[in-house]
Amino acid sequence: MAMASAACSCTDGTWWVYALPALLGSDTLCAHPALLAGLIFLATVSVALLAWATSPGGPAWTNGRGASASLLSWDPVVCPCSAASSRCPGAAAPRPRRDGPRRRPRAKELMAFSVGDTPAVVSSCPATAREVLAHPSFADRPVKRSARELMFARAIGFAPNGEYWRRLRRVASTHLFSPRRVASHEPGRQGDAEAMLRSIAAEQSASGAVALRPHLQAAALNNIMGSVFGTRYDVTSGAGAAEAEHLKSMVREGFELLGAFNWSDHLPWLAHLYDPSNVTRRCAALVPRVQTFVRGVIDEHRRRRQNSAALNDNADFVDVLLSLEGDEKLGDDDMVAILWEMVFRGTDTTALLTEWCMAELVRHPAVQARVRAEVDAAVGAGGCPTDADVARMPYLQAVVKETLRAHPPGPLLSWARLATADVPLCNGMVVPAGTTAMVNMWAITHDAAVWADPDAFAPERFLPSEGGADVDVRGVDLRLAPFGAGRRVCPGKNLGLTTVGLWVARLVHAFQWALPDGAAAVCLDEVLKLSLEMKTPLVAAAIPRTA
């Protein structure tokens, strides 16, 4: 019935084709049989194209795909270019339809739609999302053209499921992001925080307010550079500032290319005809710059290791990769891809999440005061919070979790999954092989059936001592899984959470944060690029507590 109704509705738009014979007259048509044949052909093609484009789920679900997915809920408003807007740079974050579950209860579990020739499903239900993220047939990711050309197909994020990817995952969990390795880099995180606090104090003194994001991005860049390459930049000096700006420009270009919507990913025949973002040309220009930079760092570390091959606890990622032997040993091309991905993924995500935290603390002075009191109780007014201190601050941890709930960095868990086989789900639905699957984490974290009063910023919801839930955000509980779950969970999640927690503690401990003079409110409008960003970067008054 759904297929029939869709077909009926699509023919309504072709009325003009059938009206043409009446307008032209029978004599004209009889005298020109070629014109009559052309009109019949035009009418047939018009009906076929519209039926194809407006079929349940959209055009990608034709050609038999829909037969194996007959229990899916179809998006009734999909057309060939539907869903593109939510993936375009600068698009608003995907919002759930508040009345969707009431009108179409199964749509929340799994909704089918099309992006060009790509069949896709999206889940806004924690139980179904867990199946999508944890099922072994969803262990692959669809590789965008930009990701492939930027070498990410050989890195942890996009490498296909197989022996090579399993080796990368083992190296990441055992060597790069182990608890001991994360702890060993704390002095670097503290140093980056100190430099950030000094630059914030200087801008506050000079301008009376602080644009926070550039300070966070500079600190995040140095932090990830220290962890990955063992290098930090003095951005106040000419040489250091120039090299840091060069690296930032490469990271920024990579973010734009990977976050840009490219129609050739979904209509391959457009690859050489339509590339409005110049993805191919820009990737071809960026890759040699990245290779030159990263290979130079690898060569320098290799020369250094000739004198001392010993690997200490605070070794950077390059040294760790160079120390691998046997089956774990990697070639230079693979190391370039892995190291570049680490820099790329670890820079803006940390900065943007910290900015969201601080924006909410500016909006909620009582929450900020409670965080500050918790930090002061741990280290005193003149102390310096450490990673160990932050781990014992339940309210600060709750603030970070609530920020992740209110503003999930990847609202559509941006890097989707690809079904490598037909996947039957517990609810009776079947996701066919070749389908791209996504989880709408924004919809889940703002669903009143999952979270009480979801539009309120309430860290207490994560405090068991105050009636809240002790939710693990590292992929265990799909009510809040901002780093993904299953085999493709983000390997750097612990490093990211540790860094954000420490920096929020340092920022609140050093400054009283408030709206600058003349500002009415913090703007929480969102923009979806590769991550969910504040559309208007936070500007606040950072009043030193010693003043």
Swiss-Prot record:
Domain of life: Eukaryota
Renumbered residue ranges of the record's region Disordered: 84-104
Pfam families: p450
Tissues of expression: Shoot apex.
Lipid biosynthesis keyword on record: no
Cofactors required: heme
Comp. bias intervals (Low complexity): 84-94
Class of the enzyme per the UniProt entry, highest EC level: oxidoreductase
Keywords annotated in UniProt: Heme, Iron, Metal-binding, Monooxygenase, Oxidoreductase
Keyword Metal-binding attributed: yes
Binding site for heme: 490
Enzyme Commission number(s) from the entry: 1.14.-.-
GO molecular function: heme binding; iron ion binding; monooxygenase activity; oxidoreductase activity, acting on paired donors, with incorporation or reduction of molecular oxygen
The family this protein is said to belong to: Belongs to the cytochrome P450 family.
Identification of the protein by name: Cytochrome P450 78A1
Species per Swiss-Prot/TrEMBL record: Zea mays
